[in-house]
Amino acid sequence: MKFLGGNDDRNGRGGVGVGTDAIVGSRGGVSQDAADAAGAAAAAAVGYVFQQRPSPGGVGVGVGGVGGGVPGVGAVGSTLHEAAAAEYAAHFAQKQQQTRWACGDDGHGIDNPDKWKYNPPMNPANAAPGGPPGNGSNGGPGAIGTIGMGSGLGGGGGGGAGGGNNGGSGTNGGLHHQSMAAAAANMAAMQQAAALAKHNHMISQAAAAVAAQQQHQHPHQQHPQQQQQQQQAQNQGHPHHLMGGGNGLGNGNGLGIQHPGQQQQQQQQQQQQQHPGQYNANLLNHAAALGHMSSYAQSGGSMYDHHGGAMHPGMNGGMPKQQPLGPPGAGGPQDYVYMGGQTTVPMGAAMMPPQNQYMNSSAVAAANRNAAITTSTAKKLWEKSDGKGVSSSTPGGPLHPLQIPGIGDPSSVWKDHTWSTQGENILVPPPSRAYAHGGASDTSNSGNAGILSPRDSTCAKVVEYVFSGSPTNKDSSLSGLEPHLRNLKFDDNDKSRDDKEKANSPFDTNGLKKDDQVTNSNGVVNGIDDDKGFNRTPGSRQPSPAEESQPRPPNLLFPPLPFNHMLMDHGQGMGGGLGGVVGSGNGVGGGSGGGGAGGAYAAHQQMAAQMSQLQPPMMNGVGGGMPMAAQSPMLNHQAAGPNHMESPGNLLQQQNFDVQQLFRSQNPGLAAVATNAAAAAAAAAAATSAASAAAAVGAPPVPNGSLQQSQQQQQQQQQQQQQQQMHMAAASQQFLAAQQQAQNAAYAAQQATSYVINPGQEAAPYMGMIAAAQMPYYGVAPWGMYPGNLIPQQGTQPRRPLTPSQQGAENQPYQVIPAFLDHTGSLLMGGPRTGTPMRLVSPAPVLVPPGATRAGPPPPQGPQLYQPQPQTAQQNLYSQQNGSSVGGLALNTSSLTGRRDSFDRSTSAFSPSTMDYTSSGVAAAANAVNSTVAQAAAAAAAAAAARGKWPGAMSGAASGAYGALGAGNASASPLGAPITPPPSAQSCLLGSRAPGAESRQRQQQQQQLAAVGLPATAAAAQAAVAAAANNMFGSNSSIFSNPLAIPGTAAVAAAAAAAAAANSRQVAATAAAAAAVAAAAGGVGGAPQPGRSRLLEDFRNQRYPNLQLRDLANHIVEFSQDQHGSRFIQQKLERATAAEKQMVFSEILAAAYSLMTDVFGNYVIQKFFEFGTPEQKNTLGMQVKGHVLQLALQMYGCRVIQKALESISPEQQQEIVHELDGHVLKCVKDQNGNHVVQKCIECVDPVALQFIINAFKGQVYSLSTHPYGCRVIQRILEHCTAEQTTPILDELHEHTEQLIQDQYGNYVIQHVLEHGKQEDKSILINSVRGKVLVLSQHKFASNVVEKCVTHATRGERTGLIDEVCTFNDNALHVMMKDQYANYVVQKMIDVSEPTQLKKLMTKIRPHMAALRKYTYGKHINAKLEKYYMKITNPITVGTGAGGVPAASSAAAVSSGATSASVTACTSGSSTTTTSTTNSLASPTICSVQENGSAMVVEPSSPDASESSSSVVSGAVNSSLGPIGPPTNGNVVL
């Protein structure tokens, strides 16, 4: 047993009350020795945990004797049981020192997150052994009592659980009220059964094994006696206490229903006769299956009825999922979809209509033994069935849960057994199962002890178990396990292989990343746990009939826990303000703002029935009448499962009403309810609670069985709703009526829209719940969560009717996958596995057919993708509320409050209202003629806020085009009519380029508005504007700030309000208020951006395609500073007339300097220097004077200076240049100024630039090595006179060796070699000689060496080449392989004369084969081949004497080798034909001497693969010339 992160430390930790509610005595008698024995057992079993670290409130260990007609409970029996208790006490005492606290604040690190998951405090393995079944004479020491959060509250009627009359201590807020005496009896009965089962196990372990085997063989036996006894137990009434949430105080007298623990005790007596060793079922039923606080929910049915009470930490009961359709006998208990994270309104849950009349007896019996303690992190492994059992869709019978060894063994409690790494006994389900598993069961983190976490070695052991056998072997026990393991995920973090292989798609919600998932307050994503997908086959869009055919036990999803009353969060209310609304005085408040609605059973029977499922919304200040208390960090909130947002009815209730509350609290000018925040919250709580109660009655779907009877129940429930309205407060009657009507539609839609694809396929009953909610935004209803039923689909195939009187599918929305539009307008969809919706901001209300919001037949319309449907119960999830359709377009409503996330533009805070795109805002303001001043101002403010918040058109044509926003032409599909209004003439930007940037402007406008002397009557208007401008998603700190508004539209609407107010004989006050609102609205939305005129805006938006320069009068400067405007002026100036140029010039002259430094304006100035008249050029030149240095150092001004130097007169050039005197070096080293200096040297007379030469004295080397200065030096060497360049060159020669190797200086040396005098070149070449090899290998110097070889004289070049060739072969070989020097060798080959070329070829030839191995050596070979191909002819045919072709020619052509090169060199005396075949593609080497004779160079050492044949023909008469094709240069082409 462990209390790791459970509820031993919660909000407001008080004393620890340890109650040992032993049922002792006979008919009320209390045995002292029994009390002592029970207290000792409890202290040993539980107390040691808390005794090590008691809470400040002290520890109360009470023994409460409870009598009063508890059947089957007697006094303490034999001393054998007492001895056993003592033995267990000693056993647990030994482990006391090994136990440490697992609280989060004691300094101990919790490395295993699973340790924080709550485990049932009543672990049967730790329970003291009880006696055999009591018959009034022999009992046993009671099991461990409940552990309260605070100290027990003593006194009252009988012993209390967590204290009691005999042992209560402390008064600081235990969880158990003094009126829980009856609950103690029930609890004790259950504990007695657990202790008795443990005792049986101690006595007969062998019998237990035999019984377990028998249970495997007979998993579905149900004894008639047990059934009869269960029914009798249900009919026996015993007072039970109704456990609350909040502070744990009871909120009403218990409803006299016998606790299931007593039923279990009676069942156990029968089971002992037939299955004496079967203790697992008792233990699990006691510990996990049924919680004692839910006993009041048993009236009118068996213990498998829907429990409306608190069945889980932070839960309010649950919303049972709809049963799969099928015959009555095929169904079993249904799965509960618990709405976690909420407070509980547990009053009268017993009036819930029974849900078990359609269950077969075997399912009931098996479910009684069921304790499906499964979590999303621990899927069950199912052994192959032995073929015995009831028939199911799985061949061979159902698969039994894997029996984990070590469970139930007393020795395995405190030591690590085979499957556990945690120091507690892990509960597992019993071998029997009431259904056949076609896949993994629906699970949730219920927080009980059955935890298999992937973070410990358990999973590894499970894997070993799985792979110990071969699933492919037919004889193996694992052969049936493989298809089930494929569908299991041991943790939410585990991704299937398909998820890894496929990319995330917006249509697949499983593509969500972990860090993208918003965790709700209950720890699940969007209110839906990932493992509660809507099919059991990942990747499939439809659930398989074989997997969904069998129902599941009621405790499968969230097995109710013992002591769940301990799990309620402190401070959570139980019913809003209902204690004073419908309570009868017996209700006890359970938290701040929460009142119990218990009351007398007879007086409020119907009330209790309807309020049993009340689920107060989890929103701020609405459902509970207070902010929801912070969830305890020690509570595993993932165990809460899906919250109540899954229910369509509750989704409707909480969001709609919460939005109204939001508007009332934030928009006081628009409020229609009480101004007192507390009163509004109380009214909201009452109305919401009442409406929720009325709606929740119709929420539970009908289980398998008679659908006609379900129809009758629905009618009865509707009658109860009508009766319920009579009990409601006056403030909530109107809302309740609309809420009831909406819930009727929601209930019908929930039944009608089950996920039925084919008639032969079972339905997934909870597809209607896929519209979950995001995590609340500071406790406010989620926004942008549109349920999938907003798109009623048509044209589906007829389905089987759900009821005999139900209509066909033509009136039923065919919902399969919800579609969404994101904030960009893209259509997105949510997958059917989890149904996670997309967050979006509605661009337009087009997802609902036009006729969906009207009662009766719709008006005649053209063909549409989604035809309008009649207003039926199956029409939509959201029906008429507050006179408007929440999900539709409330075009004729005057309500100013509504859902933020609806498509109702007149009520939505996040969708454009009706007044946004149409002129109805003016009409709405005009309707305020007969209203008060505040109302008129509020209407004007609303219109202004709407206009200022959303872009739109104000013209009547645009309004008529869109009418009432889709009443006639808005399509429900993106394929239909446009979903956004056409761009108006006043706006082109439909959205803000910087969302949130306009908040500052809005704030300034509000400050200006506050500064205006408004009369007192305009306070409401001012407050409304402020509230509308600073709503939640439009605040100054929000990124979802309002987009840019349309100019003038808000002011028009407010002005209309002013006119209307003036007509109402309240001219002074109202007109002033409306005028102020109009001014504020106009300032917010109508003011253009500073520096951009309307003309420029229209031009930028291409509204003036034929704009001319003359049309830009008084806008030239503005256009020049704009990118598009500047380009327009530049293009026009090239062909402009003189008058147009003068008009432009006159405007830019005043702002010439600012335009010179402008990023776009400088181009206009340059154009004038280029295409302007001489006078204009000179005038602009005069504007440059006095600013030359500043402009020269400026990025854009330097361009203007350069253009001016090219265009102005020489006199002005000199004037401009002389302004740089004294700043030459500064400009030369500047990234912008160096360009100006270079332009000066290029354009200005060199005589006028002597100051630049003078400034360079002594700075040549430093400037030559400067990235910018080296450029200026080169310009000087190009354009200056010899007298000016001589001192520069002299300094260069002094630093030649350094400059050659400098990254910038080498450019200066190269420039001298290219453009300098010959004497200067010779000086540089001589400095290179003797260093060719070294400098050629330098990155920068190699460039200089190349220039030396290129620009040297013949003698100097010969000297450089000879230096390389005559040195040694190694030098040339190194240069050819070097990455830099190889370029020098190539340059030598290019420019060398034949004598040098001969030397080079002689040196290179031996290394040609080796050069092919080097990247840079290949360049040499390529250069040689390319060079010699120019002087060779591959197809020359030589002729001998008498015109006979030379035989060698044919031989050369036919000597096919890898490559053949035929070279013909003609001289005056003979023709030489050389044919060389080389498999390595070696070229033929032919040297042509200067005297014209040809010399064939034979390979010095030809390779073995080379063959050469050279034939010299006889003498030929040179005067005849060659015979054949025309020759060119004595070479045959």
From Swiss-Prot:
The modification Phosphoserine is found at residues 453, 468, 470, 477, 505. Residues 103-117, 483-503 have a biased composition (Basic and acidic residues). Changing residue 1346 to K: Disrupts RNA-binding. Residues 1091-1428 form the PUM-HD domain. Signal peptide: none annotated. It comes from the Eukaryota. Disulfide bonds: none annotated. Residues 1234-1238 are annotated as: Non-specific-nucleotide binding in RNA target. Sequence-specific RNA-binding protein that acts as a post-transcriptional repressor by binding the 3'-UTR of mRNA targets. Binds to an RNA consensus sequence, the Pumilio Response Element (PRE), 5'-UGUANAUA-3', that is related to the Nanos Response Element (NRE). Mediates post-transcriptional repression of transcripts via different mechanisms: acts via direct recruitment of deadenylase complexes leading to translational inhibition and mRNA degradation. Also mediates deadenylation-independent repression by promoting accessibility of miRNAs. Interacts with nanos (nos) and brat. Acts via the formation of a quaternary complex composed of pum, nanos, brat and the 3'-UTR mRNA of hb. This is Maternal protein pumilio. The lineage of its organism: Eukaryota, Metazoa, Ecdysozoa, Arthropoda, Hexapoda. The gene is pum.
